[in-house]
Amino acid sequence: MSVSLVVIRLELAGHSPVPTDFGFSAAAGEMSDEEIKKKTLASAVACLEGKSAGEKAAIIHQHLGRREMTDVIIETMKARADEVRDTVEEKKPSAAPVSAQRSREQSESVNTAPESPSKQLPDQISFFSGNPSVEIVHGIMHLYKTNKMTSLKEDVRRSAMLCVLTVPATMTSHDLMKFVAPFNDVIEQMKIIRDSTPNQYMVLIKFSAQADADSFYMACNGRQFNSIEDDVCQLVYVERAEVLKSEDGASLPVMDLTELPKCTVCLERMDESVNGILTTLCNHSFHSQCLQRWDDTTCPVCRYCQTPEPVEENKCFECGVQENLWICLICGHIGCGRYVSRHAYKHFEETQHTYAMQLTNHRVWDYAGDNYVHRLVASKTDGKIVQYECEGDTCQEEKIDALQLEYSYLLTSQLESQRIYWENKIVRIEKDTAEEINNMKTKFKETIEKCDSLELRLSDLLKEKQSVERKCTQLNTRVAKLSTELQEEQELNKCLRANQLVLQNQLKEEEKLLKETCAQKDLQITEIQEQLRDVMFYLETQQQISHLPAETRQEIQEGQINIAMASAPNPPSSGAGGKLQSRKGRSKRGK
């Protein structure tokens, strides 16, 4: 036998206090609180990520629908042993101070006189108003069931916490304690939760171990609370109990969980095992059996007048059309059908609210099972779909029911074959996906190795780049310096060339002047040499004459020089005389 575990989520308003010791998880030993919270809010975080504050508020309001937050009263009752242990632990630290104070007071009473009674009164007296075990919070209680069934075998982990879904309000806390009295020794704590649902409350019972919870489940599940009333104890295993704020996305859908509506007549949760769900136009849901016992046309809860025709005020919340409307049985959202704009189906995709009812004929559609569930119920023994027992007496209605049942059987068989086909296809896809994942992992490892090698190479190249940049900077500095020096040298060369031209012109002029000066000097030297020769000749002649006798000198002084004609050659005898005369003439010129 298998059961579905439930998840209880308390969605609180922003200003509401958080109840103490409400959180629980059957997988607490396997996962930490942070991991559990992260897994719980994964879909909500993914849905709200990257949205603005206005968009987040709109999404949260869309999933809340017409549900309103009310006061939820939580009464906690702990085991007696725990209370005794807590009391002892509270008294232990104060035992020594009390004894010391008493001894100090006794010693003071011996040494001093007793004081007046007014002085012995304490300055401050502590007191507590109200019941400390009762907490009042403001929010909405959500009940989810897991899509995966859990076996009731002993070796399968389930939970150490059970939930009594519907306890009648006629049962007081004292009556409830009597009901669970045989298991008082193994119960750690009980939490009685009262919300806006009238005439009932819910109880969370935490046991010491899962074996104790299994014993209580086997003994009390389906058992009447007392022999007078017909109400029975409906127990479910609690996989997780959590408290979340509304702004964190507590009303958003949770992966692998389905939120269950409840019948407002019998106050029982409406699971797929209890089909025939009907929701009136005033947004109250009932079991088909509960509503059939109501002969009036008004709503059993609010006395709203029901009519078979669609109300004109009803319209799609998205596009505003008033035909082919479907109402969500979880939050009351009204959307158009798949033949208009598919807003009802889009609401299911966004919120995972499974059941929707057509407003015109009250037919209920299950989006998860993809079939109608308003005329079919599931047998509790074998789980097969059986015909809903209609109380109508007309033959026409029986024929219609038979046709509907036949169509449902045909649809079920076809869906079963489709399920097998798609499951096989999913297996093949999973196999191919696993191979692709392995290939991608291999490629990923290779890519990681390449990235590591490229990173090493990149680091080396960066170092080389830095060294080259430093060298380039140095070379640029040197080039700039050399360019400056080259400019200076070019300017200097230009100046030198200009000076060279000036000097060359001056040199030419100096050479020309030197030549003229040299020519003049040569002429002067020639004249001076001739004069010097004449002087030397004169001096030599004078010396020679000075050595001659006096008569000769006188003869020379008185002698005359005659210049003969050049045509007749001179006789040899006159040669000496000619020479003598020329010398005399020179000597005279010299004198």
UniProtKB/Swiss-Prot annotation:
Name any GO cellular component annotation. Answer: nucleoplasm
Where located? Cytoplasm
Q: Which residues carry this modification: Phosphoserine?
A: 52, 116, 118
Question: Does the record carry Metal-binding as a key word?
Answer: yes
Question: To which pathway does this protein belong?
Answer: Protein modification; protein ubiquitination
Enzyme Commission code = 2.3.2.27
User: Which ranges form a coiled coil?
Assistant: 430-536
Tell me the residue numbers annotated for binding Zn(2+) 2: 328, 331, 347, 353
Entry's Pfam families? BRAP2, zf-RING_2, zf-UBP
Residue ranges of region Disordered? 82-124, 563-591
Zn finger (RING-type) start-end: 263-303
Q: Where are the zinc fingers (UBP-type)?
A: 300-392
Q: Where is the composition biased (Basic and acidic residues)?
A: 82-93
Query: Which residues bind Zn(2+) 1 per the record?
Result: 316, 319, 336, 343
Compositionally biased region (Basic residues): 581-591
Keywords in UniProt for this one? Coiled coil, Cytoplasm, Metal-binding, Phosphoprotein, Transferase, Ubl conjugation pathway, Zinc, Zinc-finger
Bias (Polar residues) ranges:
108-124
GO terms (molecular function) for this protein are: identical protein binding; nuclear localization sequence binding; nucleic acid binding; ubiquitin protein ligase activity; zinc ion binding
Q: In which tissues is it expressed?
A: Isoform 2 is highly expressed in testis, lower levels in brain, heart, lung, stomach, colon, uterus, liver and kidney. Isoform 1 is only expressed in the testis. Isoform 2 is predominant over isoform 1 in both fetal and adult testis.
* Statement: the UniProt record of this protein carries the keyword Protein transport: no
Record text on subunit structure and interactions: Interacts with the nuclear localization signal of BRCA1 and with the N-terminal of KSR1. The C-terminal portion of BRCA1 interacts with DDB1.
Per the entry, what this protein does is: Negatively regulates MAP kinase activation by limiting the formation of Raf/MEK complexes probably by inactivation of the KSR1 scaffold protein. Also acts as a Ras responsive E3 ubiquitin ligase that, on activation of Ras, is modified by auto-polyubiquitination resulting in the release of inhibition of Raf/MEK complex formation. May also act as a cytoplasmic retention protein with a role in regulating nuclear transport.
- Specify the protein name: BRCA1-associated protein
Gene name linked to the record: Brap
